[in-house]
Each structure stands twice: as structure tokens, then as C-alpha cells.
Amino acid sequence: MDKKASRIRRATRARRKIAELGATRLVVHRTPRHVYAQVIAANGSEVIAAASTVEKAIREQVKYTGNVDAAKAVGKAVAERALEKGVTAVAFDRSGFQYHGRVAALAESAREAGLKF
């Protein structure tokens, strides 16, 4: 099994458990150049809030879009947008990525901005 297939298998297992809880989830995806985050409704059919380093507003705040500082900016932005829509608590879906580096930075930043998980 290759690295990507292993990550997808871990992500599927975690998403199944979150779906059983019926919780709104904060989904993180990372590539070498960008970081993406979405708050998805419990039924899985609606994106409540989203932020990524592709957006011009976030790209202008950071020097490079693929590092920890960029992930912190995305975490803060997605948390603020979710709170505006009335979402205060989420389940953190790391998409099979290790809770380390950019993924952890995004999570901590979202917590500091007021999102509970």
C-alpha cells in the first residue's frame, strides 16, 4: 500500500466515526504549496465556512503559502467565518494527515479564535 492510499484509509475511518457522532466537522487538507480548511455540516452536504491559502486576502498576509504561518492564518480565518455562521463546536478531521506541523498549527489557531474541539 502506498503512502497516499494509507492516508486515505485513515481519513475514511476517521470520517466514519465522526459521522456516527453526527458532528459538524473541520476538515483540513494540505499540499506542499497550500493549506485548505472547510467546516462541513453534520449531514455532509453543506460547506458552512471555508478558507485556504489560495485566497488573495490570506495570501497577502503571509510570505509563503505552504508553511506553519500560513496554516495559522487559515485556521484563524475559518474559525472566524464559522463563528459568524453560528457554529461554535466542531469535530477535527485531519484527513489522515499526522497531527503535526501545519495541521497542528491550523488546529491551534482555530481554537485560539474561538472554535471548540
UniProtKB/Swiss-Prot annotation:
One of its GO terms (molecular function) is 5S rRNA binding. SUPFAM superfamilies: Translational machinery components. It holds the Pfam family Ribosomal_L18p. The keyword RNA-binding applies. It comes from the Bacteria. GO terms for cellular component: cytosolic large ribosomal subunit. One of its GO terms (biological process) is translation. Keywords: Ribonucleoprotein, Ribosomal protein, RNA-binding, rRNA-binding. This is one of the proteins that bind and probably mediate the attachment of the 5S RNA into the large ribosomal subunit, where it forms part of the central protuberance. Part of the 50S ribosomal subunit; part of the 5S rRNA/L5/L18/L25 subcomplex. Contacts the 5S and 23S rRNAs. Belongs to the universal ribosomal protein uL18 family. This is Large ribosomal subunit protein uL18. It comes from Vibrio campbellii (strain ATCC BAA-1116). The gene is rplR.
